[in-house]
Amino acid sequence: FKAIFLAGGPGSGKSYIASKTAGGHGFKVLNSDKAFEYLMKQAGMSLDMTKMSPEEEAAKDVIRDRAKEMTAVQKKAWCQGKLGQVIDGTGRRYDKILKLRKQYEEMGYDTYMIFVNTSLESTIEWNKKRERKVKEDILIPAWQDVQNNLGKFQQLFGNKDFVIVDNTPDIEKGTEGATPQDLDAIWNVITKDFAVRPIRNPKAKAWIETEKGVCSIERAPERVTDQYGSPSERPAIPGWRQAEMEKERKGK
């Protein structure tokens, strides 16, 4: 009943940050990009989307739709199992996150957000180095949209359920992004403030109480003796069946 939303521009290092912070808590990572990359490789297509022909663009769009379908099936199964999840997205569309967060909360989930912040310059450089490259005319507007949503996300999730990770390289310190100390701090915040805290969502609490009630109805088998006087077990007879048996006995 815990869901962590990731937000950050393409190439900001969200997946890396998630693996180093939330991953150790057993959260399942929901990311259509993983399925997309797998299907692209299966189709023998390059992940460098800066050099695609119109025909390749069309094929890529079909594969993208298939990846989304696969991820939706995965999400449904994990939600049915009430499993903790990391929703790995860019956060470019505020309305999409707003709707998705509401869906999870309607299912009983507590929600949290990790916002991975980077400078535009470092985002462009990382995009050049990674296998799945995005065109800059898509990358730059996406980065700007995410930055514009920062304040909205902070207000939506609240200070207690929102954390910012600065993953911008520091030339003076010689770091390529968030330091091990930064990641340790985020790990501690997630552990203390979210992953292990008691569930707050009333819907989840009600579901848990219902499950407890179902379990309490199941009585232990009765200890009886067989025809030879030896101890044996038989399933407990439900109350409604006992009443019927009593009526049958009196009717004879």
Where in this protein do the model-derived segments appear?
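The conserved Walker
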Residues: 9-10
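Conserved substrate/cofactor phosphate-moiety recognition/catalytic segment
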Residues: 16-84, 95
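Hydrophobic anchor at the start of a short beta-strand
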Residues: 27, 85, 111, 160-162
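Conserved GTP-binding G-domain of TRAFAC-class P-loop NTPases and closely related GTPase folds
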Residues: 120-251
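Conserved nucleotide-binding/hydrolysis micro-motifs of P-loop NTPases
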Residues: 34-36, 92-93, 117-122, 169-172
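Conserved glycine(s) of the Walker
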Residues: 13
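Short hydrophobic/aromatic beta-strand immediately N-terminal to the Walker A/P-loop
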Residues: 4-5
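Conserved phosphate-donor/acceptor-positioning beta-strand/loop module used by diverse small-molecule
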Residues: 92, 105-126
